[in-house]
Amino acid sequence: MSKRTEQLTELLAPVVEDLGFVLWGVEYIQGRGAVLRVFIDHADGISVDDCAAVSHEVSGVLDVEDPIPGEFNLEVSSPGMDRPMFDITQYVDYIGEDVQLKLLAPVSGKRKMTAAIVAVDGDTLVVELDGETLRVPYSQVDRARLQPRFN
């Protein structure tokens, strides 16, 4: 997680939580057409009205605190079924599910893989790929997203 993303998460988490939601994660894409994506979650799901309410409150905080120079678009949404993963603690609730991983360095010769989440062991993600158990240091995970199974 970049320093800016960490700062935005720290700034926005209390705002989102005060509205009764969980801040699932924050993505900031710099450059022309910059975008700040705020993912919110709730045990009962997320509605469009929920996103609008959070967007309104988050916009106010961003206007006052001004943590991002220049113009950007704010997007507030549910993380969805194929949710991006932002923190190693988020994997615990999805043990047994598949996750797409993009790694900074290869593990067992692979930088990209879709594997089943087996466990979280401290700062290590344990996954199973083709019958082989792999230990992936979380510091090596560049991006991760749940891969829903449709049976």
UniProtKB/Swiss-Prot annotation:
Main localization of the protein described in the UniProt heading: cytoplasm
UniProt record, GO biological process: ribosomal small subunit assembly; translation
Keyword Metal-binding: no
A single cellular component GO annotation: cytosol
Subcellular location(s) per record: Cytoplasm
Domain of life from the UniProt record: Bacteria
A UniProt-annotated Pfam family: DUF150_C
Keyword vocabulary terms for this entry: Cytoplasm, Ribosome biogenesis
Family statement: Belongs to the RimP family.
Record function comment: Required for maturation of 30S ribosomal subunits.
Protein name according to UniProt: Ribosome maturation factor RimP
Lineage: Bacteria, Pseudomonadati, Pseudomonadota, Gammaproteobacteria, Oceanospirillales
